Regions:
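Glycine-centered secondary-structure boundary/capping sites
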Residues: 7, 25, 57-61, 110, ...
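Extended, solvent-exposed, turn-rich assembly/linker loops in the middle of proteins
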Residues: 16-96
Length: 179
């Protein structure tokens, strides 16, 4: 599901099998927040992300925007001069950023930023970060069909013309079809 947010399909070794943006002829929208530059207007970058998502809803509606960001991105975001005050006064909402770990939820200018450090172990025994360093993935919440999962019937004779299930389990049959 994380790779679906990124628009790619990978195999167990981490090799990209499909890039949905190239497969469907879409342009991936990327916004450089320039968090290393003190003069960057971070709110304007956030609005750029929000407008890009709103412009591409294709008739859908949304309630919120959530962003899963890398550790490095989150650290730069909360240390940036344009967001530091907002993070410090985040305590007005009940959070205590000077005393508590609030990496799970920092709303700023219309996006809820969440530090996400998920990894996956590949078949090569190496690990791969699901959100690359200094990057993030923003997506809409509260839509009707954006994150719907569809399943089809298994490739089994007894599953033909049936509704798909999330998981199929069965014992291995011998060559004559016996258990």
């Amino acid at each position: 599901e994380m790779n679906a947010l990124r628009g790619i399909v990978k195999d167990g070794a981490g090799t990209t099998l499909y890039n949905y943006f190239t497969e469907f002829g879409l342009a991936q929208i990327s916004v450089d927040f320039l968090l290393g530059t003190a003069g960057t207007l971070v709110q304007s970058k956030v609005r750029e992300v929000l407008r890009a998502i709103e412009d591409n809803l294709l008739g859908e509606s949304m309630t919120d925007v959530h962003a899963l960001v890398s550790r490095e991105f989150f650290d730069k975001l909360i240390a940036h001069p344009k967001t530091e005050e907002a993070y410090k006064f985040y305590a007005a909402t009940g959070a205590q950023p000077l005393r508590q770990d609030v990496r799970r939820n920092f709303p700023f200018a219309g996006i809820v930023f969440e530090e996400y450090a998920g990894t996956v172990t590949l078949s090569t025994k190496a690990t791969e970060r699901l959100v690359p360093a200094n990057e993030g993935i923003a997506f809409p919440l509260g839509t009707m069909d954006t994150f719907t999962t569809y399943g089809g019937p298994a490739n089994l004779l007894e599953a033909a013309n049936t509704l798909g299930l999330p998981l199929y389990a069965r014992q291995h049959l011998d060559e004559k079809g016996r258990w």
